[in-house]
Amino acid sequence: MSSMKTQVLYKSRTGNTEMLAKTIFEAIPGNSKDIALLDGQTNYDMADLYFIGFWTDRGTASVEVLDYLGSLEGKKIALFGTCGMGNSPEYYKKLEDNIKVFIEDDNEYLGAYICQGKMPISVRQKYMGMKNAMIQNFDLAMLHPDKEDLQNARVFVKEVFEKIKREA
């Protein structure tokens, strides 16, 4: 496992996913690792294990992330992402399901970590005419990703490596 090359690739629109990506990168054991912004290129340093990060819009990830996921073959893949809406495990599972279908069957899917992320102030202005629950959700999102979210990301990395270790 120590010789396993790990790559963290992410797409971030507002900085939330970037924050998570850096935390996940730091939590990966060893030195055989790299982190890069996913910007549409496909010639990233080839790795054995990929942590692929995304922001969400309308229940899925950006085209760049989905295209890259579809291009990977014979790799171990873990997903991570942020979304402004709801701190809801059910919604996060739906997001995961919507995105993981782009991963080809010859890859080993290792799970996903998704947490709430802060939204642009323009979203709050749009919410002013909506229900109080949406305003409350925005206000809660301003505190995320928080220390607990980042710690949970570290735990997720540990769980991924434990899954790999059990297979060996």
Question: Predicted regions span which residues?
Answer:
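Short amphipathic alpha-helix with an adjacent loop that forms part of the alpha/beta core around
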Residues: 40-45
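FMN-binding flavodoxin-like domain, especially the glycine-rich phosphate-binding loop
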Residues: 26-34, 47-52, 56-168
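N-terminal beta1-alpha1 ligand-phosphate binding loop
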Residues: 5-27
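A short, aromatic/hydrophobic, helix- or strand-capping loop or linear motif
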Residues: 37
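Secondary-structure boundary/capping motif
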Residues: 4-5, 47
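Basic/polar N-terminal segments that are highly enriched at the extreme N-terminus
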Residues: 1-4, 168
